[in-house]
């Protein structure tokens, strides 16, 4: 039955960064400077990004993405989950902010084995992409988890005020550490799309911190280069390829990097990922989109949408 849970978690993994959760291990100081996956150098500070002024961002309110999660292991080779990402704007305390809604679910046949529903909501500033609030509502089989985060930046010691519930541990109110490189997963997803690849050194690991449940975790981004790749349902696309390194945990092996391809155009669309998990390999691909800010100019030969 554990394999079903692994796949369920991968349905959630697809989206915020296309991909960044799944019960990793909390960050330890001795792991931050250690080489991993063949990438030894660690860049200082947060990932380099382009201008975060609203008019310069890679996206706009009204953008929508659909994704499909696929699993392969031996004779098993099937789509197991769907996910969507929507971005809009709203007014909070008199201030215009972005609101991101991320939904993930297992497909109907997989519901019979292990039903999953994921709902992530994030609010962050339109200028600077500063996280303000985050909620999570997760159901994985009989397991339930809910998070509510408020970012307390104006306190003597900035922190995330986290109201966390799980069906296994009950209700908890905790304070999570907060610095300028700490994001919730949807906010990190949108920050990463503004990465300045011209300022990134290939092969160097750039650390970021994300919060989920009652802890914070490190993820490392590694630029690998550019390539034209054929993606099922899309066609041939010019892409920027990079890796995300996560620490080993319940789903990820920690031995290999998750590979991510984004469009090599002004949209920086997340197109595809591949990730080795403890049993088999999971992948995700873009299956639908609308409301792009810029032309999808990296799509050089289209197969039409699935």
What are these regions (language model features)?
Residues 8-18:
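Bacterial N-terminal signal peptides
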Residues 23-153, 196-306:
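Acidic, serine/threonine-rich low-complexity disordered tracts
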Residues 1-6:
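Positively charged n-region of N-terminal signal peptides that target proteins for export
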């Amino acid at each position: 039955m554990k394999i079903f849970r692994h796949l369920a978690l991968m349905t959630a993994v697809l989206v915020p960064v296309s991909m960044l959760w799944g019960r990793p291990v909390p960050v330890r100081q001795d792991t931050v400077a250690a080489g991993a996956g063949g990438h030894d150098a660690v860049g200082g500070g947060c990932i380099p990004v382009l201008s975060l002024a609203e008019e310069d961002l890679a996206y706009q309110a009204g953008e929508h993405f659909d994704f499909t999660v696929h699993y392969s292991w031996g004779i098993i080779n099937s789509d197991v989950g769907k996910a969507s990402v929507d971005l809009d704007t709203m007014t909070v305390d008199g201030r215009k902010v972005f609101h991101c809604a991320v939904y993930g679910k297992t497909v109907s046949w997989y519901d019979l084995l292990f039903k999953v529903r994921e709902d992530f909501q994030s609010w962050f500033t339109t200028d600077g992409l500063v996280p303000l609030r985050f909620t999570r509502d997760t159901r994985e089989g009989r397991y339930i988890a809910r998070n509510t985060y408020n970012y307390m930046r104006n306190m003597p010691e900035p922190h995330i005020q986290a109201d966390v519930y799980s069906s296994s541990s009950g209700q908890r109110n905790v304070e999570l550490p907060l610095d300028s490189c700490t994001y919730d997963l949807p906010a990190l997803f949108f920050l990463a799309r503004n990465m300045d690849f011209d300022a990134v050194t290939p092969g160097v690991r750039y650390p970021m911190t994300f919060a989920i449940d009652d802890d914070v975790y490190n993820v490392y981004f590694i630029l690998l280069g550019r390539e034209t790749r054929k993606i099922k349902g899309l066609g041939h696309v010019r892409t920027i390829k990079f890796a995300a390194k996560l620490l080993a945990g319940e789903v990820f092996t920690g031995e290999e990097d998750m590979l991510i391809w984004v469009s090599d155009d002004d949209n920086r669309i997340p197109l595809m990922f591949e990730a080795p998990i403890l049993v088999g390999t999971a992948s995700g691909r873009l299956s639908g989109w609308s409301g792009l800010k810029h032309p999808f100019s990296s799509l050089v030969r289209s197969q039409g949408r699935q």
